[in-house]
Amino acid sequence: MIWHVQNENFILDSTRIFMKAFHLLLFHGSFIFPECILIFGLILLLMIDSTSDQKDRPWFYFISSTSLIISITALLFRWREEPIISFSGNFQTNNFNEIFQFLILLCSTLCIPLSVEYIECTEMAITEFLLFVLTATLGGMFLCGANDLITIFVAPECFSLCSYLLSGYTKRDVRSNEATMKYLLMGGASSSILVHGFSWLYGSSGGEIELQEIVNGLINTQMYNSPGISIALISITVGIGFKLSPAPFHQWTPDVYEGSPTPVVAFLSVTSKVAASASATRIFDIPFYFSSNEWHLLLEILAILSMILGNLIAITQTSMKRMLAYSSIGQIGYVIIGIIVGDSNDGYASMITYMLFYISMNLGTFACIVLFGLRTGTDNIRDYAGLYTKDPFLALSSALCLLSLGGLPPLAGFFGKLHLFWCGWQAGLYFLVSIGLLTSVVSIYYYLKIIKLLMTGRNQEITPYVRNYRRSPLRSNNSIELSMTVCVIASTIPGISMNPILAIAQDTLF
Protein backbone atom coordinates (compact mmCIF):
# COMPACT_ATOMS: atom_id res chain seq x y z
CA MET A 1 0.00 0.00 0.00
CA ILE A 2 2.81 2.41 0.93
CA TRP A 3 4.67 1.48 -2.27
CA HIS A 4 1.51 2.16 -4.31
CA VAL A 5 1.09 5.65 -2.79
CA GLN A 6 4.77 6.46 -3.32
CA ASN A 7 4.51 5.31 -6.93
CA GLU A 8 1.48 7.56 -7.51
CA ASN A 9 3.31 10.52 -5.97
CA PHE A 10 6.31 9.86 -8.20
CA ILE A 11 4.07 9.78 -11.29
CA LEU A 12 2.37 13.03 -10.25
CA ASP A 13 5.70 14.76 -9.60
CA SER A 14 7.08 13.55 -12.93
CA THR A 15 3.96 14.79 -14.71
CA ARG A 16 4.28 18.23 -13.10
CA ILE A 17 7.95 18.47 -14.10
CA PHE A 18 7.13 17.40 -17.66
CA MET A 19 4.26 19.90 -17.93
CA LYS A 20 6.46 22.70 -16.58
CA ALA A 21 9.18 21.84 -19.10
CA PHE A 22 6.60 21.71 -21.90
CA HIS A 23 5.19 25.08 -20.79
CA LEU A 24 8.68 26.65 -20.81
CA LEU A 25 9.46 25.22 -24.24
CA LEU A 26 6.10 26.32 -25.63
CA PHE A 27 6.43 29.94 -24.51
CA HIS A 28 10.22 30.32 -24.74
CA GLY A 29 11.07 27.90 -27.55
CA SER A 30 11.28 30.66 -30.14
CA PHE A 31 14.20 32.19 -28.23
CA ILE A 32 16.23 29.00 -28.69
CA PHE A 33 14.97 28.15 -32.18
CA PRO A 34 18.49 27.49 -33.61
CA GLU A 35 19.17 25.09 -30.74
CA CYS A 36 15.80 23.38 -31.28
CA ILE A 37 16.77 22.73 -34.90
CA LEU A 38 19.86 20.85 -33.73
CA ILE A 39 17.79 18.89 -31.21
CA PHE A 40 15.39 17.92 -34.00
CA GLY A 41 18.39 16.85 -36.13
CA LEU A 42 19.65 14.68 -33.26
CA ILE A 43 16.27 12.97 -32.89
CA LEU A 44 16.05 12.42 -36.65
CA LEU A 45 19.52 10.85 -36.69
CA LEU A 46 18.55 8.43 -33.93
CA MET A 47 15.31 7.49 -35.67
CA ILE A 48 17.00 6.82 -39.02
CA ASP A 49 19.82 4.88 -37.37
CA SER A 50 17.38 2.61 -35.55
CA THR A 51 15.27 1.89 -38.65
CA SER A 52 17.83 1.65 -41.47
CA ASP A 53 21.02 -0.13 -42.46
CA GLN A 54 24.52 1.12 -43.26
CA LYS A 55 23.54 1.85 -46.88
CA ASP A 56 21.87 5.05 -45.70
CA ARG A 57 25.11 6.56 -44.38
CA PRO A 58 24.99 9.54 -46.79
CA TRP A 59 21.72 10.53 -45.13
CA PHE A 60 23.50 10.89 -41.80
CA TYR A 61 25.93 13.45 -43.24
CA PHE A 62 23.10 15.21 -45.05
CA ILE A 63 20.89 15.51 -41.96
CA SER A 64 23.75 16.72 -39.76
CA SER A 65 24.99 19.30 -42.25
CA THR A 66 21.46 20.47 -43.11
CA SER A 67 20.48 20.96 -39.47
CA LEU A 68 23.64 23.01 -38.89
CA ILE A 69 23.05 25.16 -41.98
CA ILE A 70 19.39 25.76 -41.08
CA SER A 71 20.46 26.69 -37.56
CA ILE A 72 22.95 29.21 -38.98
CA THR A 73 20.20 30.65 -41.19
CA ALA A 74 17.87 31.00 -38.19
CA LEU A 75 20.61 32.87 -36.31
CA LEU A 76 21.17 35.25 -39.22
CA PHE A 77 17.45 36.04 -39.47
CA ARG A 78 17.44 36.86 -35.75
CA TRP A 79 20.37 39.28 -36.05
CA ARG A 80 19.96 42.80 -34.59
CA GLU A 81 16.92 41.90 -32.51
CA GLU A 82 16.55 43.38 -29.04
CA PRO A 83 18.28 41.45 -26.20
CA ILE A 84 15.90 39.00 -24.55
CA ILE A 85 16.23 37.04 -21.29
CA SER A 86 14.19 33.84 -21.29
CA PHE A 87 13.67 30.62 -19.32
CA SER A 88 13.30 32.49 -16.02
CA GLY A 89 16.62 34.26 -16.46
CA ASN A 90 18.65 31.18 -17.43
CA PHE A 91 19.26 32.15 -21.05
CA GLN A 92 20.01 35.45 -22.77
CA THR A 93 19.71 36.20 -26.48
CA ASN A 94 21.69 39.14 -27.87
CA ASN A 95 24.08 39.94 -30.71
CA PHE A 96 27.17 39.19 -28.65
CA ASN A 97 26.03 35.66 -27.79
CA GLU A 98 24.70 35.00 -31.28
CA ILE A 99 27.96 35.81 -33.07
CA PHE A 100 29.77 33.24 -30.92
CA GLN A 101 27.00 30.74 -31.59
CA PHE A 102 27.46 31.46 -35.29
CA LEU A 103 31.19 30.73 -35.00
CA ILE A 104 30.52 27.42 -33.24
CA LEU A 105 27.99 26.38 -35.89
CA LEU A 106 30.44 27.39 -38.61
CA CYS A 107 33.15 25.22 -37.03
CA SER A 108 30.85 22.20 -36.86
CA THR A 109 29.60 22.71 -40.42
CA LEU A 110 33.16 22.72 -41.76
CA CYS A 111 34.28 19.81 -39.56
CA ILE A 112 31.68 17.31 -40.78
CA PRO A 113 33.00 17.21 -44.39
CA LEU A 114 36.52 16.83 -42.95
CA SER A 115 35.38 13.66 -41.21
CA VAL A 116 33.71 11.82 -44.10
CA GLU A 117 36.73 10.13 -45.66
CA TYR A 118 38.44 9.58 -42.31
CA ILE A 119 35.40 7.75 -40.90
CA GLU A 120 35.07 5.59 -44.01
CA CYS A 121 38.75 4.64 -44.01
CA THR A 122 38.93 3.88 -40.29
CA GLU A 123 35.48 2.20 -40.28
CA MET A 124 34.31 4.13 -37.24
CA ALA A 125 30.64 4.24 -36.23
CA ILE A 126 29.22 7.18 -38.13
CA THR A 127 25.96 7.79 -36.24
CA GLU A 128 27.52 8.07 -32.79
CA PHE A 129 30.26 10.33 -34.15
CA LEU A 130 27.75 12.78 -35.63
CA LEU A 131 25.57 12.60 -32.51
CA PHE A 132 28.50 13.57 -30.32
CA VAL A 133 29.48 16.41 -32.65
CA LEU A 134 25.95 17.85 -32.75
CA THR A 135 25.48 17.45 -28.99
CA ALA A 136 28.81 19.17 -28.31
CA THR A 137 27.74 21.96 -30.66
CA LEU A 138 24.47 22.25 -28.76
CA GLY A 139 26.33 22.47 -25.45
CA GLY A 140 28.60 25.17 -26.83
CA MET A 141 25.64 27.20 -28.09
CA PHE A 142 23.87 27.01 -24.74
CA LEU A 143 27.10 28.06 -23.02
CA CYS A 144 27.31 31.17 -25.21
CA GLY A 145 23.81 32.24 -24.14
CA ALA A 146 24.00 31.08 -20.51
CA ASN A 147 22.94 33.78 -18.07
CA ASP A 148 23.16 32.00 -14.71
CA LEU A 149 25.72 29.90 -12.84
CA ILE A 150 23.82 26.62 -13.20
CA THR A 151 23.55 26.87 -16.98
CA ILE A 152 27.17 28.04 -17.23
CA PHE A 153 28.17 24.82 -15.46
CA VAL A 154 25.79 22.35 -17.14
CA ALA A 155 26.33 23.57 -20.74
CA PRO A 156 30.14 23.09 -20.80
CA GLU A 157 29.72 19.71 -19.11
CA CYS A 158 27.50 18.68 -22.02
CA PHE A 159 30.25 19.83 -24.37
CA SER A 160 33.01 18.21 -22.31
CA LEU A 161 31.35 14.79 -22.04
CA CYS A 162 30.99 14.63 -25.82
CA SER A 163 34.60 15.80 -26.16
CA TYR A 164 35.82 12.96 -23.93
CA LEU A 165 33.87 10.42 -25.98
CA LEU A 166 35.11 11.84 -29.28
CA SER A 167 38.76 11.94 -28.18
CA GLY A 168 38.58 8.25 -27.23
CA TYR A 169 36.60 7.23 -30.30
CA THR A 170 39.38 5.01 -31.65
CA LYS A 171 39.23 2.60 -28.72
CA ARG A 172 41.97 0.30 -30.04
CA ASP A 173 44.54 3.09 -30.17
CA VAL A 174 46.64 3.14 -26.98
CA ARG A 175 47.54 6.82 -27.47
CA SER A 176 43.87 7.72 -27.81
CA ASN A 177 42.99 5.89 -24.59
CA GLU A 178 45.83 7.58 -22.72
CA ALA A 179 44.84 11.01 -24.02
CA THR A 180 41.19 10.45 -23.12
CA MET A 181 42.03 9.37 -19.59
CA LYS A 182 44.19 12.45 -19.02
CA TYR A 183 41.53 14.66 -20.61
CA LEU A 184 38.77 13.14 -18.45
CA LEU A 185 40.66 13.36 -15.15
CA MET A 186 41.84 16.92 -15.69
CA GLY A 187 38.42 17.95 -16.99
CA GLY A 188 36.72 16.54 -13.89
CA ALA A 189 39.19 18.29 -11.60
CA SER A 190 38.74 21.63 -13.39
CA SER A 191 34.95 21.33 -13.23
CA SER A 192 35.06 20.78 -9.47
CA ILE A 193 37.29 23.85 -9.07
CA LEU A 194 34.88 25.86 -11.23
CA VAL A 195 31.92 24.82 -9.06
CA HIS A 196 33.92 25.77 -5.97
CA GLY A 197 34.36 29.26 -7.40
CA PHE A 198 30.66 29.46 -8.25
CA SER A 199 29.77 28.52 -4.66
CA TRP A 200 31.82 31.43 -3.31
CA LEU A 201 30.19 33.76 -5.83
CA TYR A 202 26.74 32.44 -4.90
CA GLY A 203 27.32 32.86 -1.17
CA SER A 204 28.95 36.28 -1.41
CA SER A 205 26.07 37.68 -3.47
CA GLY A 206 23.42 36.53 -1.01
CA GLY A 207 22.21 33.53 -2.98
CA GLU A 208 21.96 34.97 -6.49
CA ILE A 209 22.72 32.89 -9.59
CA GLU A 210 21.93 35.24 -12.50
CA LEU A 211 24.98 37.17 -13.66
CA GLN A 212 23.54 40.67 -13.36
CA GLU A 213 21.75 39.85 -10.12
CA ILE A 214 25.07 38.66 -8.67
CA VAL A 215 26.45 42.17 -9.18
CA ASN A 216 23.42 43.68 -7.41
CA GLY A 217 23.75 41.11 -4.63
CA LEU A 218 27.42 41.93 -4.10
CA ILE A 219 26.51 45.61 -3.79
CA ASN A 220 23.77 44.84 -1.26
CA THR A 221 25.98 42.56 0.85
CA GLN A 222 29.05 44.82 0.48
CA MET A 223 31.10 41.70 -0.36
CA TYR A 224 32.51 42.85 -3.71
CA ASN A 225 35.99 43.39 -2.22
CA SER A 226 35.95 40.44 0.19
CA PRO A 227 38.48 37.56 0.25
CA GLY A 228 35.67 35.26 -0.90
CA ILE A 229 35.47 37.10 -4.22
CA SER A 230 39.23 36.67 -4.67
CA ILE A 231 38.89 32.93 -4.05
CA ALA A 232 35.99 32.80 -6.50
CA LEU A 233 37.99 34.69 -9.11
CA ILE A 234 41.01 32.39 -8.85
CA SER A 235 38.88 29.22 -8.89
CA ILE A 236 36.80 30.33 -11.87
CA THR A 237 39.94 31.40 -13.74
CA VAL A 238 41.41 27.93 -13.22
CA GLY A 239 38.17 26.25 -14.34
CA ILE A 240 37.81 28.36 -17.47
CA GLY A 241 41.56 28.09 -18.08
CA PHE A 242 41.20 24.35 -18.64
CA LYS A 243 38.64 24.99 -21.39
CA LEU A 244 40.76 27.69 -23.06
CA SER A 245 44.01 25.73 -22.46
CA PRO A 246 46.40 28.64 -21.92
CA ALA A 247 49.64 27.92 -20.07
CA PRO A 248 49.90 26.58 -17.37
CA PHE A 249 46.53 24.81 -17.87
CA HIS A 250 47.62 23.27 -21.16
CA GLN A 251 48.95 19.89 -20.02
CA TRP A 252 46.11 17.93 -21.60
CA THR A 253 46.29 19.69 -24.97
CA PRO A 254 49.37 18.09 -26.66
CA ASP A 255 48.41 14.53 -25.68
CA VAL A 256 44.78 14.93 -26.73
CA TYR A 257 45.79 16.52 -30.04
CA GLU A 258 48.25 13.73 -30.79
CA GLY A 259 46.16 10.77 -29.64
CA SER A 260 42.67 11.72 -30.81
CA PRO A 261 41.35 11.19 -34.36
CA THR A 262 42.42 14.15 -36.49
CA PRO A 263 38.87 15.35 -37.39
CA VAL A 264 38.05 15.32 -33.68
CA VAL A 265 41.13 17.41 -32.94
CA ALA A 266 40.10 19.87 -35.66
CA PHE A 267 36.65 20.16 -34.08
CA LEU A 268 37.88 20.54 -30.49
CA SER A 269 40.69 22.94 -31.37
CA VAL A 270 38.26 25.67 -32.40
CA THR A 271 34.84 25.03 -30.83
CA SER A 272 36.16 24.69 -27.27
CA LYS A 273 38.06 27.97 -27.54
CA VAL A 274 35.13 29.86 -29.08
CA ALA A 275 32.66 28.66 -26.43
CA ALA A 276 35.07 29.23 -23.53
CA SER A 277 35.97 32.71 -24.80
CA ALA A 278 32.29 33.70 -24.98
CA SER A 279 31.73 32.45 -21.45
CA ALA A 280 34.91 34.07 -20.09
CA THR A 281 34.03 37.52 -21.42
CA ARG A 282 30.63 37.49 -19.74
CA ILE A 283 31.77 35.97 -16.44
CA PHE A 284 34.74 38.29 -15.98
CA ASP A 285 33.00 41.41 -17.26
CA ILE A 286 29.74 41.13 -15.31
CA PRO A 287 30.06 39.37 -11.89
CA PHE A 288 33.67 40.50 -11.43
CA TYR A 289 32.99 44.07 -12.47
CA PHE A 290 34.44 45.37 -9.18
CA SER A 291 37.56 43.18 -9.52
CA SER A 292 38.58 44.24 -13.01
CA ASN A 293 42.18 45.05 -12.03
CA GLU A 294 42.62 41.63 -10.44
CA TRP A 295 41.26 39.56 -13.33
CA HIS A 296 43.11 41.73 -15.84
CA LEU A 297 46.35 40.88 -14.03
CA LEU A 298 45.52 37.16 -13.94
CA LEU A 299 44.71 37.07 -17.65
CA GLU A 300 47.83 39.07 -18.53
CA ILE A 301 49.97 36.46 -16.76
CA LEU A 302 48.16 33.65 -18.60
CA ALA A 303 48.56 35.44 -21.94
CA ILE A 304 52.30 36.02 -21.46
CA LEU A 305 52.93 32.42 -20.37
CA SER A 306 50.84 31.07 -23.26
CA MET A 307 52.51 33.16 -25.96
CA ILE A 308 56.04 32.41 -24.74
CA LEU A 309 55.75 28.72 -23.79
CA GLY A 310 53.38 27.77 -26.61
CA ASN A 311 55.52 29.19 -29.39
CA LEU A 312 58.90 28.17 -27.95
CA ILE A 313 57.90 24.55 -27.30
CA ALA A 314 56.26 24.32 -30.74
CA ILE A 315 59.71 24.75 -32.33
CA THR A 316 60.91 21.43 -30.86
CA GLN A 317 57.95 19.29 -31.98
CA THR A 318 58.28 16.55 -34.59
CA SER A 319 54.55 15.77 -34.93
CA MET A 320 52.29 18.10 -36.89
CA LYS A 321 49.41 17.67 -34.46
CA ARG A 322 51.57 18.31 -31.39
CA MET A 323 53.05 21.34 -33.11
CA LEU A 324 49.55 22.71 -33.74
CA ALA A 325 48.67 21.93 -30.11
CA TYR A 326 51.42 24.19 -28.80
CA SER A 327 50.66 26.69 -31.55
CA SER A 328 47.05 26.85 -30.33
CA ILE A 329 48.32 27.59 -26.82
CA GLY A 330 50.18 30.57 -28.23
CA GLN A 331 47.15 31.61 -30.28
CA ILE A 332 44.88 31.69 -27.24
CA GLY A 333 47.36 34.10 -25.67
CA TYR A 334 46.61 36.53 -28.51
CA VAL A 335 42.86 36.05 -28.01
CA ILE A 336 43.20 36.83 -24.29
CA ILE A 337 44.53 40.28 -25.24
CA GLY A 338 41.12 41.04 -26.76
CA ILE A 339 39.34 39.80 -23.61
CA ILE A 340 41.51 42.06 -21.43
CA VAL A 341 40.94 45.11 -23.63
CA GLY A 342 37.21 44.44 -23.43
CA ASP A 343 34.51 46.66 -24.82
CA SER A 344 36.73 49.73 -24.84
CA ASN A 345 39.01 50.24 -27.85
CA ASP A 346 37.17 47.53 -29.84
CA GLY A 347 38.78 44.71 -27.87
CA TYR A 348 35.85 42.33 -28.28
CA ALA A 349 35.47 43.19 -31.96
CA SER A 350 39.14 42.45 -32.64
CA MET A 351 38.92 39.20 -30.65
CA ILE A 352 35.86 38.02 -32.59
CA THR A 353 37.46 38.95 -35.92
CA TYR A 354 40.66 37.12 -35.09
CA MET A 355 38.72 34.05 -33.95
CA LEU A 356 36.86 33.99 -37.26
CA PHE A 357 40.18 34.00 -39.11
CA TYR A 358 41.66 31.46 -36.68
CA ILE A 359 38.82 29.05 -37.44
CA SER A 360 39.59 29.10 -41.16
CA MET A 361 43.38 28.96 -40.68
CA ASN A 362 43.29 26.14 -38.16
CA LEU A 363 40.64 24.01 -39.87
CA GLY A 364 42.40 24.48 -43.21
CA THR A 365 45.65 23.19 -41.72
CA PHE A 366 43.91 20.22 -40.11
CA ALA A 367 42.17 19.42 -43.40
CA CYS A 368 45.60 19.15 -45.01
CA ILE A 369 46.80 16.92 -42.16
CA VAL A 370 43.74 14.66 -42.53
CA LEU A 371 44.35 14.23 -46.27
CA PHE A 372 48.08 13.63 -45.92
CA GLY A 373 47.58 11.24 -43.01
CA LEU A 374 45.00 9.14 -44.86
CA ARG A 375 47.19 8.89 -47.95
CA THR A 376 50.49 8.18 -46.19
CA GLY A 377 49.65 6.99 -42.67
CA THR A 378 52.11 9.37 -40.99
CA ASP A 379 51.93 12.55 -38.97
CA ASN A 380 55.65 13.29 -38.67
CA ILE A 381 56.76 16.71 -39.87
CA ARG A 382 59.87 15.43 -41.66
CA ASP A 383 57.71 13.05 -43.73
CA TYR A 384 56.10 16.03 -45.47
CA ALA A 385 59.36 16.74 -47.31
CA GLY A 386 58.82 17.11 -51.05
CA LEU A 387 55.01 17.01 -50.94
CA TYR A 388 54.86 19.79 -53.55
CA THR A 389 56.30 17.42 -56.18
CA LYS A 390 53.41 14.97 -55.72
CA ASP A 391 50.45 17.13 -54.72
CA PRO A 392 51.01 20.85 -55.39
CA PHE A 393 47.46 21.78 -54.38
CA LEU A 394 47.74 20.18 -50.94
CA ALA A 395 51.22 21.60 -50.36
CA LEU A 396 50.16 25.10 -51.42
CA SER A 397 47.03 24.94 -49.25
CA SER A 398 49.09 23.88 -46.24
CA ALA A 399 51.59 26.67 -46.87
CA LEU A 400 48.91 29.37 -47.12
CA CYS A 401 47.17 28.27 -43.91
CA LEU A 402 50.47 28.07 -42.01
CA LEU A 403 51.58 31.47 -43.27
CA SER A 404 48.24 32.93 -42.21
CA LEU A 405 48.62 31.37 -38.75
CA GLY A 406 52.04 32.99 -38.55
CA GLY A 407 50.55 36.36 -39.46
CA LEU A 408 52.35 37.20 -42.69
CA PRO A 409 50.82 39.85 -45.00
CA PRO A 410 48.61 40.02 -46.99
CA LEU A 411 46.87 36.99 -45.46
CA ALA A 412 43.92 37.17 -43.06
CA GLY A 413 45.98 36.19 -40.03
CA PHE A 414 48.19 39.26 -40.45
CA PHE A 415 45.29 41.73 -40.46
CA GLY A 416 43.59 39.91 -37.58
CA LYS A 417 46.71 40.10 -35.41
CA LEU A 418 47.42 43.66 -36.50
CA HIS A 419 44.02 44.90 -35.34
CA LEU A 420 44.19 42.84 -32.14
CA PHE A 421 47.63 44.19 -31.23
CA TRP A 422 46.64 47.74 -32.17
CA CYS A 423 43.62 47.59 -29.84
CA GLY A 424 45.87 46.27 -27.07
CA TRP A 425 48.40 49.05 -27.69
CA GLN A 426 45.67 51.72 -27.54
CA ALA A 427 44.49 50.23 -24.23
CA GLY A 428 47.97 50.62 -22.75
CA LEU A 429 48.99 46.94 -22.83
CA TYR A 430 52.42 47.79 -24.21
CA PHE A 431 54.33 44.92 -22.60
CA LEU A 432 51.68 42.35 -23.56
CA VAL A 433 51.60 43.53 -27.19
CA SER A 434 55.41 43.53 -27.36
CA ILE A 435 55.48 39.91 -26.18
CA GLY A 436 52.83 39.12 -28.77
CA LEU A 437 54.88 40.65 -31.58
CA LEU A 438 58.07 38.83 -30.54
CA THR A 439 56.36 35.46 -30.20
CA SER A 440 54.65 35.97 -33.57
CA VAL A 441 58.12 36.23 -35.12
CA VAL A 442 59.05 32.97 -33.36
CA SER A 443 55.92 31.28 -34.73
CA ILE A 444 56.78 32.40 -38.26
CA TYR A 445 60.08 30.55 -37.91
CA TYR A 446 58.61 27.11 -37.24
CA TYR A 447 55.83 27.60 -39.78
CA LEU A 448 58.38 28.53 -42.46
CA LYS A 449 60.48 25.52 -41.49
CA ILE A 450 57.54 23.26 -42.38
CA ILE A 451 56.83 25.16 -45.60
CA LYS A 452 60.46 24.73 -46.63
CA LEU A 453 60.05 20.97 -46.20
CA LEU A 454 56.85 20.99 -48.25
CA MET A 455 58.40 22.84 -51.16
CA THR A 456 61.78 21.10 -51.37
CA GLY A 457 62.46 19.56 -54.76
CA ARG A 458 65.67 17.65 -54.16
CA ASN A 459 65.24 13.90 -54.52
CA GLN A 460 67.49 13.02 -51.61
CA GLU A 461 65.20 14.94 -49.23
CA ILE A 462 61.92 13.41 -50.44
CA THR A 463 60.73 10.80 -47.95
CA PRO A 464 59.41 7.34 -48.90
CA TYR A 465 55.95 8.43 -47.72
CA VAL A 466 55.84 11.20 -50.31
CA ARG A 467 57.59 9.09 -52.95
CA ASN A 468 54.81 6.47 -52.67
CA TYR A 469 52.11 9.12 -52.27
CA ARG A 470 48.81 8.27 -53.97
CA ARG A 471 45.58 10.21 -54.17
CA SER A 472 42.56 8.61 -52.54
CA PRO A 473 40.10 6.99 -54.96
CA LEU A 474 37.13 7.64 -52.70
CA ARG A 475 34.48 10.03 -53.95
CA SER A 476 34.18 11.48 -50.46
CA ASN A 477 37.59 12.95 -51.09
CA ASN A 478 35.74 15.81 -52.79
CA SER A 479 34.08 16.89 -49.53
CA ILE A 480 37.29 17.22 -47.57
CA GLU A 481 39.00 19.09 -50.40
CA LEU A 482 35.97 21.37 -50.64
CA SER A 483 36.25 22.22 -46.94
CA MET A 484 39.97 22.73 -47.33
CA THR A 485 39.44 25.09 -50.28
CA VAL A 486 36.85 27.12 -48.36
CA CYS A 487 39.21 27.43 -45.38
CA VAL A 488 42.17 28.42 -47.57
CA ILE A 489 40.12 31.12 -49.31
CA ALA A 490 38.85 32.37 -45.94
CA SER A 491 42.45 32.48 -44.67
CA THR A 492 43.60 34.74 -47.49
CA ILE A 493 40.95 36.98 -49.06
CA PRO A 494 39.02 38.38 -46.02
CA GLY A 495 42.14 40.05 -44.66
CA ILE A 496 42.13 42.51 -47.55
CA SER A 497 38.55 43.63 -46.83
CA MET A 498 38.34 43.66 -43.04
CA ASN A 499 36.13 46.72 -42.57
CA PRO A 500 32.76 44.95 -43.10
CA ILE A 501 33.82 42.11 -40.78
CA LEU A 502 34.94 44.56 -38.10
CA ALA A 503 31.72 46.56 -38.47
CA ILE A 504 29.66 43.43 -37.78
CA ALA A 505 31.89 42.46 -34.85
CA GLN A 506 31.61 45.96 -33.34
CA ASP A 507 27.83 45.53 -33.26
CA THR A 508 28.04 42.73 -30.69
CA LEU A 509 27.88 44.63 -27.41
CA PHE A 510 26.04 42.92 -24.58
UniProtKB/Swiss-Prot annotation:
GO molecular function per UniProt: NADH dehydrogenase (ubiquinone) activity; quinone binding
Subcellular location, principal: plastid
A Pfam family of this chain: Ndh2_N
NCBIfam families: NDH_I_N, PRK02504.1
Cleaved signal peptide residues: none
A biological-process GO annotation: ATP synthesis coupled electron transport
Chain's role: NDH shuttles electrons from NAD(P)H:plastoquinone, via FMN and iron-sulfur (Fe-S) centers, to quinones in the photosynthetic chain and possibly in a chloroplast respiratory chain. The immediate electron acceptor for the enzyme in this species is believed to be plastoquinone. Couples the redox reaction to proton translocation, and thus conserves the redox energy in a proton gradient.
EC number: 7.1.1.-
Organism: Ensete ventricosum
Classification via PANTHER family: NADH DEHYDROGENASE
The protein, known as: NAD(P)H-quinone oxidoreductase subunit 2, chloroplastic
Keywords: Chloroplast, Membrane, NAD, NADP, Plastid, Plastoquinone, Quinone, Thylakoid, Translocase, Transmembrane, Transmembrane helix, Transport
Membrane topology: Multi-pass membrane protein
Enzyme class: translocase
Transmembrane segments: 24-44, 59-79, 99-119, 124-144, 149-169, 183-203, 229-249, 295-315, 323-343, 354-374, 395-415, 418-438
NAD among keywords: yes
Subunit structure comment from the entry: NDH is composed of at least 16 different subunits, 5 of which are encoded in the nucleus.
Similarity remark: Belongs to the complex I subunit 2 family.
UniProt subcellular location: Plastid, Chloroplast thylakoid membrane
Designated gene of the protein: ndhB
Catalyzed chemical reaction(s): a plastoquinone + NADH + (n+1) H(+)(in) = a plastoquinol + NAD(+) + n H(+)(out); a plastoquinone + NADPH + (n+1) H(+)(in) = a plastoquinol + NADP(+) + n H(+)(out)
